[in-house]
């Protein structure tokens, strides 16, 4: 039991870590300075795309030109800013054909990936409460809820990772095929795939914890039920016997037990009050000593022998 609690607390830290990494991913592009400027999805050479900067970085909320380690000429911020060079800079003869012909592919992959990222963070936050309580509370519903929320969070985080990876890896390949430099943002992709790994471990352990917790609770219930079936409890016949043989009185005489169906009842005879003839006969009857009995011819006792003075 101690080992299970230790592992559950350790995996709970994994859940916290996944939530923290996902939160940083959502903040990508929230500011144009500081640490957040290094959390980008793709950096590529966009020179010649109409009025686009020579080097562009794409974030969650906008895209910015990158020169001499600083961001400049950023676009307006908007949630789930789509990755689509055709929409970002307009159509151009220098724009690779894949961005013109497959515009919807890049557009919806980036936007749906953002939505899946938000949903995964929502389920991660929900899983924190039962994940912590499952270590200390014996209720069966808590580990089951923890397991369900963990698998939902894992499903949406891996879906977001696949959508983002598919979108920007395809874009990097398109840029490089056109003779332009392009690279993925190392921090963003490291964070999102690390979150996938942490949530996978969390989901697997929550399933094991829920299954073992349920089996232990079932065994305890069986033991509790067995106590009620213990032979130490008096049976109905024993209770009837003890009640019948009881000598307790209520002040007016002995308590008579209720008759039991199917059991022969003892019969008693009573002598009417004031009738003393029975006791008078007992007084006049004389018991004859055994020494005064005369032996019979057949070895028995013939009867009393009269002794005369």
UniProtKB/Swiss-Prot annotation:
It is a multi-pass membrane protein. It is found in: Cell membrane. Involved in sporulation and affects the sphingolipid composition of the plasma membrane. PANTHER family: PROTEIN SUR7, SUR7 FAMILY PROTEIN FMP45. This is SUR7 family protein FMP45. Residues 258-274 have a biased composition (Low complexity). Present with 329 molecules/cell in log phase SD medium. Induction: By osmotic and salt stresses. Belongs to the SUR7 family. Residues 253-309 are annotated as: Disordered. Residues 1-5, 138-140, 210-309 are cytoplasmic. The keyword Acetylation does not apply. The keyword GTP-binding does not apply. The modification Phosphothreonine is found at residue 235. GO terms for biological process: ascospore formation; cortical actin cytoskeleton organization; endocytosis; fungal-type cell wall organization; septin cytoskeleton organization. GO terms for cellular component: cell cortex; cell periphery; membrane raft; mitochondrion; plasma membrane. It comes from the Eukaryota.
């Amino acid at each position: 039991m101690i080992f299970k609690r230790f592992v559950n607390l350790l995996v709970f830290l994994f859940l916290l870590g996944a939530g923290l990494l996902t939160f940083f991913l959502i903040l990508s592009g929230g500011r144009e300075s500081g640490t957040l400027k290094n959390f980008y999805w793709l950096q590529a050479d966009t020179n010649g795309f109409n009025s686009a900067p020579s080097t562009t970085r794409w974030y969650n909320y906008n895209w910015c030109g990158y020169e001499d380690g600083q961001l400049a000429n950023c676009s307006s911020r908007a949630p789930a800013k789509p990755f689509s060079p055709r929409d970002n800079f307009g159509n151009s003869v220098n724009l690779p054909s894949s961005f013109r012909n497959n515009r919807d592919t890049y557009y919806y992959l980036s936007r749906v990936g953002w939505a899946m990222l938000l949903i995964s963070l929502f389920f991660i936050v929900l899983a924190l409460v039962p994940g912590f309580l499952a270590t200390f509370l014996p209720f069966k519903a808590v580990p089951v809820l923890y397991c369900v929320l963990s698998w939902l969070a894992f499903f949406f985080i891996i879906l977001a990772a696949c959508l983002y990876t598919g979108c920007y890896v395809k874009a990097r390949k398109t840029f490089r095929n056109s003779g332009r430099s392009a690279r993925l943002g190392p921090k963003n992709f490291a964070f999102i795939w690390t979150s996938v790994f942490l949530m996978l471990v969390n989901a697997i352990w929550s399933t094991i914890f829920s299954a073992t917790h349920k089996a232990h609770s079932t065994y305890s219930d069986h033991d509790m039920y067995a106590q009620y079936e213990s032979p130490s409890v008096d049976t109905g016949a024993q209770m009837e016997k003890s009640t019948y043989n009881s000598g307790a009185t209520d002040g007016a005489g002995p308590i008579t037990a209720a008759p039991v169906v199917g059991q022969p009842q003892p019969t008693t005879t009573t002598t009417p009050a004031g009738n003393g003839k029975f006791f008078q006969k007992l007084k006049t009857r004389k018991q004859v000593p055994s020494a005064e009995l005369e032996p019979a011819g057949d070895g028995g006792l013939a009867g009393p022998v009269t002794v005369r003075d």
